Swiss-Prot record:
Keyword Methyltransferase: yes
Protein known as: Cobalt-precorrin-5B C(1)-methyltransferase
Biological classification of the source: Archaea, Thermoproteota, Thermoprotei, Sulfolobales, Sulfolobaceae
Enzyme class: transferase
EC number assigned by the record: 2.1.1.195
Protein family per UniProt: Belongs to the CbiD family.
This protein's UniProt keywords: Cobalamin biosynthesis, Methyltransferase, S-adenosyl-L-methionine, Transferase
Record has Secreted as a keyword: no
SUPFAM superfamilies, sorted: CbiD-like (SSF111342)
Pathway note: Cofactor biosynthesis; adenosylcobalamin biosynthesis; cob(II)yrinate a,c-diamide from sirohydrochlorin (anaerobic route): step 6/10
Species: Saccharolobus islandicus (strain L.S.2.15 / Lassen #1)
Catalytic activity: Co-precorrin-5B + S-adenosyl-L-methionine = Co-precorrin-6A + S-adenosyl-L-homocysteine
Amino acid sequence: MIINSLKRFGITTGAAASAAAKAAVIGLLNREKRNTVVIPTPIGLRLEIPVEKVEIDSGIACAEVKKFSGDNPDILDGLVIRCCAKLNESNEIVIVGGKGVGKVTRSGLKATMGETAISPTVRDMVINAIREVTDKGIQITIEVPNGDIIAENTLNKMVGIVGGISILGTTGIETPVSDDDYLEHIKCELNVIRQSYDFVVIAPGNSAAKYASKLFDSNSIIKVGDRIGDSIKLASSVFRKVILAGLPAKLLKVYAGIFNTHYSQGDARLESLTHASVLAGLPYDVLTKITNALSVEEAFTYMTKEQRRKVMKIVAEKILSRIKSFNGDINFCVIIFDYDSESLSRVGC
């Protein structure tokens, strides 16, 4: 099978906002309308991003960037992110969400309840992009035209974000959705890791990989996206030990027997968390709150650290049992991280 090396990567809403903010600040301070800007990303890469429009007025400048999703079937592809910049009297950069950016109405998300749904990583990206232009105080307002309408077709309401979309992204880059080509890429990457290690750490996403790198050499870690089950099968045939390291929400799907964790394949996160919490003997009032939560992150806010550890131990043990059911000879380990990067449970390690 030949890998399709021409798969197109995209940019996150956070990267689009950072580019629009930088273009707006250049327009404000230099009275210059850029067609493209280059922004830094949290992973060290620099992205050159097209700018659709720049408007310059007295004391304010606005710029628009279209989100590009690459080969992902993303409803947000082509979405316009608009940022307006004006000077403020401090030396700080103040970022606010305007029309079309959602507000957080439930606890447990990365943004604080009551604030606009702009993740801390995106705020840092915007600040870093602007600081390449000026050290002056700037106020940035991020807007998404028709964001409230588009959000109706996303999962935002289910997690407590209303009135618009979320401005997110951990790397600034959107990788092509998991498919057979990507699975072939995983095979190649596993072979490379095997040249230096007799174990491999499988991490579903960026945050899991980042947290795992505190425990293992980063070169022994592979990010596999949604293809967790396939990746474990591939790895078990060439490595002495396979370690699955992830965050609760993703691994709760595996707990339920969902080994391809793409949303189209099923979702049993809160049901799984409730089931494990019952087995852990959590009090009825806590169980009620968990079942009514809109996200795993929110449910975790109702549990003590010790309760989370107890529940995640049950989850990890069940995952270990499931994996061994289709590969009894595998030397397998499960690590579940809390959302602050602390290890909640280690089973089989």
